[in-house]
Amino acid sequence: MTNLRKTHPLMKIINSSFIDLPAPSNISSWWNFGSLLGICLIIQILTGLFLAMHYTSDTLTAFSSVTHICRDVNYGWLIRYMHANGASMFFICLFLHVGRGLYYGSYMFLETWNIGVLLLFAVMATAFMGYVLPWGQMSFWGATVITNLLSAIPYIGSDLVEWIWGGFSVDKATLTRFFAFHFILPFIIAAMAGVHLLFLHETGSNNPSGLCSDADKIPFHPYYTIKDILGVLLLILVLTTLVLFSPDLLGDPDNYTPANPLNTPPHIKPEWYFLFAYAILRSIPNKLGGVLALVLSILILAIVPLLHTSKQRSMMFRPFSQCLFWILVADLITLTWIGGQPVEHPFIIIGQLASILYFLLILVLMPITSILENNLLKW
């Protein structure tokens, strides 16, 4: 008799995705981040659901409702900090997942990669709107500054900003709609992640060597299920350590002050995971130019497959490209640091140089180095 998991209409989808899926035998721990992102999304949806039961999206009571969750709701503090720090873990996994894709040439799966880029935008939008909800000082001013950037769009800019605000400033209408979008977007992200997986399973996974692994496949279960479970346990260990010992480590103290439109904080800055893009935005004195650079800093990922000039897929056997890749990583860390600094002498020029280097590495240096490596190998 054929196994039920291979015949039942629902079970066979799960079977072909997580049990009998042929996987390369040599994929490393860098391939764990897909499943970790799935776990992060589940944690965020569940904690968010319980927070939404107690939160009120009204400018007068939003801040108080978050305080009420932390003080009066059973384990409310735990749910709130799991959600806030869960977002940080989500972005750590996202950056490592994208970095893995860049290093090992996973971007050659075009559909999977492009849906991944859209997912990155969707997660960033969701995180931004979530940061506005507690209605602290940094929530309010962050929302004001970032939405105001759209006014740089010619002709329709100012109308667009007022349309998003639902008035002439960030107010009750803005908070209510941000809450609505923040609630619905994770479910859209979950659906997109399903499509992301669908396209991945059309081609099969890449592997560290970048070579075709059809001749050497192993079943996903038990080999990679157990490996993924180890990754999940480590993720939960790091997240719970962060939540229980230092829940405010990655937050901003200004957000413990209720929003006040009459008092601007000395340094307006987003959460740490947006600082690299914020630094690129600030490094260009022109408003429209800054906004374009901000969008392009993420959108550039979509054109990475077009810039692949190497005859090898992975960077595993390309030492010069590896050097440039790690310079890019160092550059992004530098940009993240600069994004959190005030706009004054040494930081302005460092930010501008780091921004130029970021685009130069991806658009010019890496493709040229790949061609050089091709010639060195006499291919």
Swiss-Prot record:
<dbReference type="Pfam" id="PF00032">
    <property type="entry name" value="Cytochrom_B_C"/>
</dbReference>
<keyword id="KW-0812">Transmembrane</keyword>
<keyword id="KW-0472">Membrane</keyword>
<feature type="transmembrane region" description="Helical">
    <location>
        <begin position="178"/>
        <end position="198"/>
    </location>
</feature>
<comment type="subunit">
    <text>The cytochrome bc1 complex contains 11 subunits: 3 respiratory subunits (MT-CYB, CYC1 and UQCRFS1), 2 core proteins (UQCRC1 and UQCRC2) and 6 low-molecular weight proteins (UQCRH/QCR6, UQCRB/QCR7, UQCRQ/QCR8, UQCR10/QCR9, UQCR11/QCR10 and a cleavage product of UQCRFS1). This cytochrome bc1 complex then forms a dimer.</text>
</comment>
<feature type="binding site" description="axial binding residue">
    <location>
        <position position="83"/>
    </location>
    <ligand>
        <name>heme b b562</name>
    </ligand>
</feature>
<feature type="transmembrane region" description="Helical">
    <location>
        <begin position="288"/>
        <end position="308"/>
    </location>
</feature>
<dbReference type="InterPro" id="IPR048260">
    <property type="entry name" value="Cytochrome_b_C_euk/bac"/>
</dbReference>
<keyword id="KW-0479">Metal-binding</keyword>
<dbReference type="GO" id="GO:0045275">
    <property type="term" value="C:respiratory chain complex III"/>
</dbReference>
<dbReference type="InterPro" id="IPR027387">
    <property type="entry name" value="Cytb/b6-like_sf"/>
</dbReference>
<feature type="transmembrane region" description="Helical">
    <location>
        <begin position="226"/>
        <end position="246"/>
    </location>
</feature>
<feature type="transmembrane region" description="Helical">
    <location>
        <begin position="320"/>
        <end position="340"/>
    </location>
</feature>
<keyword id="KW-0679">Respiratory chain</keyword>
<protein>
    <recommendedName>
        <fullName>Cytochrome b</fullName>
    </recommendedName>
</protein>
<dbReference type="InterPro" id="IPR036150">
    <property type="entry name" value="Cyt_b/b6_C_sf"/>
</dbReference>
<dbReference type="GO" id="GO:0005743">
    <property type="term" value="C:mitochondrial inner membrane"/>
</dbReference>
<feature type="transmembrane region" description="Helical">
    <location>
        <begin position="77"/>
        <end position="98"/>
    </location>
</feature>
<dbReference type="InterPro" id="IPR005798">
    <property type="entry name" value="Cyt_b/b6_C"/>
</dbReference>
<feature type="transmembrane region" description="Helical">
    <location>
        <begin position="33"/>
        <end position="53"/>
    </location>
</feature>
<feature type="binding site" description="axial binding residue">
    <location>
        <position position="182"/>
    </location>
    <ligand>
        <name>heme b b562</name>
    </ligand>
</feature>
<feature type="binding site" description="axial binding residue">
    <location>
        <position position="196"/>
    </location>
    <ligand>
        <name>heme b b566</name>
    </ligand>
</feature>
<dbReference type="InterPro" id="IPR048259">
    <property type="entry name" value="Cytochrome_b_N_euk/bac"/>
</dbReference>
<keyword id="KW-0349">Heme</keyword>
<dbReference type="InterPro" id="IPR030689">
    <property type="entry name" value="Cytochrome_b"/>
</dbReference>
<keyword id="KW-0408">Iron</keyword>
<feature type="binding site" description="axial binding residue">
    <location>
        <position position="97"/>
    </location>
    <ligand>
        <name>heme b b566</name>
    </ligand>
</feature>
<keyword id="KW-0830">Ubiquinone</keyword>
<feature type="transmembrane region" description="Helical">
    <location>
        <begin position="113"/>
        <end position="133"/>
    </location>
</feature>
<feature type="transmembrane region" description="Helical">
    <location>
        <begin position="347"/>
        <end position="367"/>
    </location>
</feature>
<keyword id="KW-0813">Transport</keyword>
<dbReference type="GO" id="GO:0046872">
    <property type="term" value="F:metal ion binding"/>
</dbReference>
<keyword id="KW-0999">Mitochondrion inner membrane</keyword>
<keyword id="KW-0496">Mitochondrion</keyword>
<keyword id="KW-1133">Transmembrane helix</keyword>
<dbReference type="InterPro" id="IPR005797">
    <property type="entry name" value="Cyt_b/b6_N"/>
</dbReference>
<comment type="function">
    <text>Component of the ubiquinol-cytochrome c reductase complex (complex III or cytochrome b-c1 complex) that is part of the mitochondrial respiratory chain. The b-c1 complex mediates electron transfer from ubiquinol to cytochrome c. Contributes to the generation of a proton gradient across the mitochondrial membrane that is then used for ATP synthesis.</text>
</comment>
<feature type="binding site">
    <location>
        <position position="201"/>
    </location>
    <ligand>
        <name>a ubiquinone</name>
    </ligand>
</feature>
<comment type="similarity">
    <text>Belongs to the cytochrome b family.</text>
</comment>
<dbReference type="Pfam" id="PF00033">
    <property type="entry name" value="Cytochrome_B"/>
</dbReference>
<dbReference type="GO" id="GO:0006122">
    <property type="term" value="P:mitochondrial electron transport, ubiquinol to cytochrome c"/>
</dbReference>
<dbReference type="GO" id="GO:0008121">
    <property type="term" value="F:ubiquinol-cytochrome-c reductase activity"/>
</dbReference>
